[in-house]
């Protein structure tokens, strides 16, 4: 490019363009060579695990169910309960535990003798297909992510075991009439979100009835009275295929030693103070003072209930009604 313009502005633009060209050539010549990924080799020798993982996961589609469409994928479930928290104001039960799910992946089979005797393979949960087991009666709003991140264990037969930590929030119909000596029953209903029973068949583990309590936190406010797991097939008018769900019926009894001191003792004191007001002579000055103190204590007592318990018609605690 040669600048033939006689005008000052044209000559300036031409020089500016030449400057950009020269700078581009300088940066291009000084930039380091980018190595070709195809020529790079790892600095370590591939293990049997590396080779097997590369073979199994190459062209693996984690969004495709690993079975023929005519065959159902059987998922065996075991829920290990660890801790319960009940929010009376929101009528929501929070369940903490582990969810054990086991199924067979036809795409993840191998012969041990051909792969150095490798008897298991650990894969990240996002690398392979997983059943979309969701809590149907969830109280967590738009979030349906019940499970934490954990690895899956795969065996040569194609069996996959996944045991993620789980947290479920479920609505409960609370009956607080006997509070704080109440017993509550809540239900967790789990099922596949997109697959029917002919595609994903949920089964309760026969050895544990679908749940375990060995790791239960015994220091919880609630004592587990009973847990039952039931499998059911639901049919809807839209479809001919069954939809399988698993329901855990949980019965909890409140442990109330602390509530006896906080609630029952003041309630008994209110009753005695009210009776004492009738026992005093009508013209006694202490009677007005005693009745005034009783009214203040009752107001504080009811204020405590309003902050602790929901205002539900037909479920008012008897201890609050008596006071």
Regions found by a protein language model. Give the residues of each.
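Non-transmembrane, solvent-exposed beta-strand/loop segments in proteins
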Residues: 10-12, 18-19, 25-292, 304-322
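Aromatic-anchored segments of alpha-helical transmembrane domains
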Residues: 298-304
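Winged helix-turn-helix DNA-binding recognition segment
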Residues: 295
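N-terminal secretory signal peptides that target proteins for export/translocation
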Residues: 1-9
């Amino acid at each position: 490019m040669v600048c033939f313009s006689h005008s000052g502005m044209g000559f300036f633009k031409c020089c500016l363009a030449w400057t950009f060209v020269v700078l581009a050539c300088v940066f291009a010549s000084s930039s380091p060579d980018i190595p070709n990924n195809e020529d790079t080799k790892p600095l370590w020798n591939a293990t049997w695990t590396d080779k097997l993982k590369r073979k199994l996961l190459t062209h693996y589609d984690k969004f495709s169910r690993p079975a023929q469409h005519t065959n159902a994928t059987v998922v065996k479930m075991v829920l290990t309960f660890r801790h319960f928290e009940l929010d009376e104001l929101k009528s929501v039960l929070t369940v903490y535990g582990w969810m054990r799910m086991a199924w067979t992946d036809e795409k993840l089979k191998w012969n041990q003798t051909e792969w150095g005797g490798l008897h298991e393979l650990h894969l990240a949960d996002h690398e392979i297909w997983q059943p979309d087991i969701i809590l149907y009666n969830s109280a967590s709003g738009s979030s349906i992510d019940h499970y934490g991140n954990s690895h899956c264990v795969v065996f040569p037969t194609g069996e996959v075991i996944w045991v993620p930590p789980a947290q479920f929030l479920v609505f409960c119909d609370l009956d607080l009439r006997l509070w704080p000596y109440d017993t509550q029953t809540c239900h967790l209903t789990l099922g596949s979100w997109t697959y029917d029973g002919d595609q994903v068949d949920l089964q309760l583990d026969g050895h544990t009835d679908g749940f375990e309590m060995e790791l239960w936190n015994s220091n919880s406010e609630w004592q587990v009275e009973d847990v039952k797991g039931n499998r059911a097939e639901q049919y809807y008018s839209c479809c001919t295929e069954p939809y399988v769900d698993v329901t855990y019926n949980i019965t909890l009894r409140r442990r109330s030693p602390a509530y006896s001191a906080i609630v029952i003792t003041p309630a008994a004191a209110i009753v005695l103070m009210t009776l004492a007001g009738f026992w005093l002579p009508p013209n006694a000055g202490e009677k007005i003072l005693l009745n005034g103190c009783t009214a203040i204590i009752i107001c504080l007592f009811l204020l405590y209930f309003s902050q602790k318990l929901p205002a539900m018609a037909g479920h008012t605690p008897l201890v609050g009604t008596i006071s």
